C-alpha cells in the first residue's frame, strides 16, 4: 500500500484529490496539510511514501517545504502538483529533490501513474513541462526571468513580500531576525533592479511568479 499525503492550501483541492484517490487499489491517503509548515509536521507523524505538494502556499511554500522535508525524510517522494508551469518553478522544485512535477490540470490516471512511478524510484514530469525543460536545455544560457538571479531563500521571501506579509510575520515564520529579513529584501531589490514592494509585485505578476487573478 502506497501512503499518500496531500498538501494544498485550498480545502476543495485537498478534498477533491483525496476523494479521487480513495477508490484506487494500492493507494491510501493518510492525511492532508494546508501549508508547508503543516506538511512537515504531518510527514513526521504519518510517514507517507509520497507527498503531493502544492507550490504556492502561505508561509514557507512548497519549494522550501520540499527542501526541508527531504532533508529530514530523504526516502519520501515529493510530487509537485501546481498551476505553475513556467520556470523557475519546475527547475527549482526538481533541483530541491522533488521526484515529480505535474500540473493541476492533470487527470486522475496521470496522477496515479505519477504516484506509482515515483514510489518505484522513477521520476515523473508532465509532458508539457518536460517539453518545456527539454527545449530550455537547448537554448542559449540567458536569464529569461530576473527571478533566476535569486536564491531559493530570496524567492521564498520575495513571494511572501508579494503576498503582503509584514517583515515581523516573515521573521516569525522563517525563524529569522527582522534585520536579516530586511537584508534579504534589499538584496532582492538590488538583484531585480527595483526599489519598492509594488515594483516587486508587478515584476512577479509579469513573470508568472504569482497569479494576477488571485
UniProtKB/Swiss-Prot annotation:
InterPro entries: CheY-like_superfamily, Sig_transdc_resp-reg_C-effctor, Sig_transdc_resp-reg_receiver, Tscrpt_reg_LuxR_C, WalR-like. One of its GO terms (molecular function) is DNA binding. Residues 143-208 form the HTH luxR-type domain. Forms part of a two-component regulatory system GacA/GacA(LemA). May be involved in lesion formation, swarming and in the production of extracellular protease, syringomycin and N-acyl-L-homoserine lactone (acyl-HSL). It comes from the Bacteria. The gene is gacA. The keyword NAD does not apply. PROSITE patterns: HTH_LUXR_1, HTH_LUXR_2, RESPONSE_REGULATORY. Phosphorylated by LemA. This is Response regulator GacA. Keywords: Activator, DNA-binding, Phosphoprotein, Transcription, Transcription regulation, Two-component regulatory system. The modification 4-aspartylphosphate is found at residue 54. The keyword Transport does not apply. Gene3D superfamilies: 3.40.50.2300. Residues 167-186 bind DNA. PANTHER family: RESPONSE REGULATOR UVRY, TWO-COMPONENT RESPONSE REGULATOR. It holds the Pfam family Response_reg. Residues 3-119 form the Response regulatory domain. It comes from Pseudomonas syringae pv. syringae (strain B728a). One of its GO terms (biological process) is regulation of DNA-templated transcription.
Amino acid at each position: 500500500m502506497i501512503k499518500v499525503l496531500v498538501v494544498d492550501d485550498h480545502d476543495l483541492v485537498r478534498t477533491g484529490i483525496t476523494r479521487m484517490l480513495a477508490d484506487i487499489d494500492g493507494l491510501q491517503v493518510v492525511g492532508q496539510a494546508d501549508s508547508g509548515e503543516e506538511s512537515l509536521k504531518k510527514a513526521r507523524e504519518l510517514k507517507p511514501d509520497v507527498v503531493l505538494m502544492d507550490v504556492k502556499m502561505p508561509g514557507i511554500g512548497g519549494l522550501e517545504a520540499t527542501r526541508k522535508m527531504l532533508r529530514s525524510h530523504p526516502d519520501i517522494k515529493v510530487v509537485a502538483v501546481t498551476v505553475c508551469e513556467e520556470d523557475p518553478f519546475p527547475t527549482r522544485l526538481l533541483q530541491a529533490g522533488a521526484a515529480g512535477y505535474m500540473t493541476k490540470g492533470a487527470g486522475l490516471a496521470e496522477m496515479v501513474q505519477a504516484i506509482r512511478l515515483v514510489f518505484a524510484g522513477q521520476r515523473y514530469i508532465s509532458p508539457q513541462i518536460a517539453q518545456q525543460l527539454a527545449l530550455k536545455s537547448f537554448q542559449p544560457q540567458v536569464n529569461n526571468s530576473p527571478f533566476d538571479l535569486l536564491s531559493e531563500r530570496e524567492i521564498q521571501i520575495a513571494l511572501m513580500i508579494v503576498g503582503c506579509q509584514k517583515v515581523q510575520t516573515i521573521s516569525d515564520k522563517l525563524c529569522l531576525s527582522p534585520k536579516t529579513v530586511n537584508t534579504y529584501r534589499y538584496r532582492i531589490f538590488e538583484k531585480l533592479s527595483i526599489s519598492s514592494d509594488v515594483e516587486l509585485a508587478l515584476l512577479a505578476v509579469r513573470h508568472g511568479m504569482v497569479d494576477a487573478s488571485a
